[in-house]
From Swiss-Prot:
Changing residue 174 to P: In PCWH; without Hirschsprung disease; reduced DNA binding capacity. Residues 23-32 have a biased composition (Low complexity). This is Transcription factor SOX-10. The transactivation domains TAM and TAC (for transactivation domain in the middle and at the C-terminus, respectively) are required to contact transcriptional coactivators and basal transcriptional machinery components and thereby induce gene transactivation. Gene3D superfamilies: High mobility group box domain. Changing residue 108 to T: Found in a patient with Kallmann syndrome. It comes from Homo sapiens (Human). The gene is SOX10. Residues 1-67, 160-199, 212-274, 354-375, 433-466 are annotated as: Disordered. Transcription factor that plays a central role in developing and mature glia. Specifically activates expression of myelin genes, during oligodendrocyte (OL) maturation, such as DUSP15 and MYRF, thereby playing a central role in oligodendrocyte maturation and CNS myelination. Once induced, MYRF cooperates with SOX10 to implement the myelination program. Transcriptional activator of MITF, acting synergistically with PAX3. Transcriptional activator of MBP, via binding to the gene promoter.
């Protein structure tokens, strides 16, 4: 048994490479008469992948000495006697546990009892079988056994369990590495997610500061000083070049939280206008919308319309594409003075209570401005966030010629309610389709701090879906 322990240790020691060299010459003569023994002797010489199988077979062979020829055993003894075992840290190398106390293995269950006994027998009968193939075969055979065939192994496993309990009364199974690996992996994933969120927040903060910087040229632009020449006002330069990712840009600009909306992650916002009656939203437009940061611009859009930013209208239009800027915000943003050449004039009966209106998204074509005030009209008030004035890209088309920009006009308009006065959020998608979300304010008559006071509101009417 001492020699068996030495054999297992020499497999794990640096001298293990010497042992195969000694085994190979000695095992060569035994190939002829004893194919099984010679085969097992030769299997010690291949690479370390076979060491586990060779060690098992050598340990099994020590029980019956006739498995290995005399020359093999003499060669092994010669190698082991010449090696200084104090050079090898045995506890660490053999069981991998802490040096203080050796690792106690769990008692074998019934299948392990069966597999260990059957593996020895099969390895003796079929020495050429690979260990993995043996394991597969043993598993299949075990599943085919009935209860009566399994009973002896179950009884032996129970006996081993009781013996193990006697030998190690305070034994507690403590799986070591697998659990820690999973925990470490989970910890690695969590900081990754936090880092991703942190990166997104940093990008959004960057865009927010960029918009604050762009606000100052925007304050001098015609959008805020009442100059009707909006193309020159927009030539102050769009805040972002076309190559800028739209997700961060829009997340830094749009604040859907004010309407109680929750935006979806995948660019398809789940819009829940709490008290707003929405028409059917065009799926194409919604799919083209990028993700928004819900909490980013709440400071710019106070719920009750603080006079510092928006005195009487708690809304702001953020233009994110040349087309939509023309479509929506231009009449609202740029043409503030009453004398602006708008295709429409505000309806005679604009209700001061500002019923929130929506327009149905009409796939049949771009919405058109109509001159006669009707119930599906929406009076857009001037958007009074001058620091977003420069957010509009320069427009090269006539001011309200946006029919070619919008294949499907997703204006939210309802034909069943009185026309309401509210400013529009224009969230521009990548394909430059404006999406109007309306915010109503019950006091739309007060003066505005950063923009001219009440100018005549342009009235937009759109065709509803047939």
């Amino acid at each position: 048994m001492a020699e068996e322990q030495d054999l297992s240790e020499v497999e794990l020691s640096p001298v293990g490479s010497e042992e195969p060299r000694c085994l190979s010459p000695g095992s060569a003569p035994s190939l002829g008469p004893d194919g099984g023994g010679g085969g097992s002797g030769l299997r010690a010489s291949p690479g370390p992948g076979e060491l586990g199988k060779v060690k098992k077979e050598q340990q099994d062979g020590e029980a019956d000495d006739d498995k290995f020829p005399v020359c093999i055993r003499e060669a092994v003894s010669q190698v082991l006697s010449g090696y200084d075992w104090t050079l090898v840290p045995m506890p660490v190398r053999v069981n991998g546990a802490s040096k203080s106390k050796p690792h106690v293995k769990r008692p074998m269950n019934a299948f392990m009892v069966w597999a260990q006994a059957a593996r020895r027998k099969l390895a003796d009968q079929y020495p050429h079988l690979h260990n993995a193939e043996l394991s597969k075969t043993l598993g299949k055979l075990w599943r085919l056994l009935n209860e009566s065939d399994k009973r002896p192994f179950i009884e032996e496993a129970e006996r081993l369990r009781m013996q193990h309990k006697k030998d190690h009364p305070d034994y507690k199974y403590q799986p070591r590495r697998r659990k820690n690996g999973k925990a470490a992996q989970g910890e690695a994933e969590c900081p990754g997610g936090e880092a991703e969120q942190g990166g997104t927040a940093a990008i959004q903060a960057h865009y927010k500061s960029a918009h604050l910087d762009h606000r100052h040229p925007g304050e001098g632009s015609p959008m805020s000083d009442g100059n009707p020449e909006h193309p020159s006002g927009q030539s102050h330069g769009p805040p972002t070049p076309p190559t800028t990712p739209k997700t961060e840009l829009q997340s830094g600009k749009a604040d859907p939280k004010r309407d109680g909306r929750s935006m979806g992650e995948g660019g398809k916002p789940h819009i829940d206008f709490g008290n707003v009656d929405i028409g059917e939203i065009s799926h194409e437009v919604m799919s083209n919308m990028e993700t928004f940061d819900v909490a980013e611009l709440d400071q710019y859009l106070p719920p009750n319309g603080h006079p510092g930013h928006v005195s009487s209208y708690s809304a702001a239009g953020y233009g994110l594409g040349s087309a939509l800027a023309v479509a929506s915000g231009h009449s609202a943003w740029i043409s503030k003075p009453p004398g602006v050449a708008l295709p429409t004039v505000s309806p005679p009966g604009v209700d001061a209570k500002a019923q929130v209106k929506t327009e149905t998204a009409g796939p049949q074509g771009p919405p058109h401005y109509t001159d006669q005030p009707s119930t599906s009209q929406i009076a857009y008030t001037s958007l009074s966030l001058p620091h977003y004035g420069s957010a509009f890209p320069s427009i090269s088309r006539p001011q309200f010629d946006y029919s070619d920009h919008q294949p499907s006009g997703p204006y939210y308009g309802h034909s069943g309610q009185a026309s309401g006065l509210y400013s529009a959020f224009s969230y521009m998608g990548p394909s430059q389709r404006p999406l109007y979300t309306a915010i109503s304010d019950p006091s739309p008559s007060g003066p505005q701090s950063h923009s001219p006071t009440h100018w005549e509101q342009p009235v937009y009417t759109t065709l509803s879906r047939p």
